Each structure stands twice: as C-alpha cells, then as structure tokens.
Amino acid sequence: MDAALYFPRLLRAGAGGAAPVAVAASGAVAGVYVRTDVQRGVWRAPAGTDARVVGTVGPEVRLTDGQSGELNRQGINVIRALPGHGTVVWGSRTLRGADAMADEYKYVPVSRLALHLQDSITRGIRCTTFEQND
C-alpha cells in the first residue's frame, strides 16, 4: 500500500559542463516528500505546483497532457516541466492507484496518513504492553 512509481527519470547537470546525465527520480521525489511533510503535513499530497523538484535540469522526457493523463490512469505519477513552475511532481497515486482498481489506498497521502497514524498509535501505547487488561 505504500509504494509509488514516478516517471520519467531526471536530468542533472553533467560534471564540468558535460551533457546532462539521466538519474533515477527516487532521491528527488523523496526530497519532495520530506519538504511536503515539514511544510504541509503527511496528509497532503506531495504533488502539484508546490511540489517542485530542485537541483535538476528537468525531466528526461517531456510529456504532453494526454500522455500524463494516460500514465496517471495507470497509477504512474509523472514528473513534468511546467512553464512558470519548473520541474514538478504531477500525481500522487500509489501502485494500487490505477483507475481500473477501486482501492481505499489509491492515493499517496491516504496511504501515508494511515501509516503515520498506525505508527503513532503503536508508539503511544507501547508503555502498556505488559499492563493488566481486566
């Protein structure tokens, strides 16, 4: 329930003025998650125009609106270069988020909030593990 897929890879500047190099988006997307958590909370989607990907030249592949929509319907989140916003994460579906599936954990913020609550409750009641339960 807590996995998501992001496409395409990102381009980072090449060393010493060399051509840009394609790298996996996972590190940059993790950074967007952390920034979203700190600024807005785990219950907010790490996507949209506020979800800028910093430190990259841009996405390896430029997607059209139609291509982005089709990938999103399949549960694949896209990384897009939007005029006026830069490179952003555009989509917040889990791997259970394809339109063909009806799943309560279809979206990243729902899944992450459930995991956060589970962890918080577990930590909160740990001190009562060996208490009597009559």
Predicted segments with their positions:
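A glycine- and small-residue-enriched flexible loop/hinge signal that marks low-structured segments
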Residues: 1-134
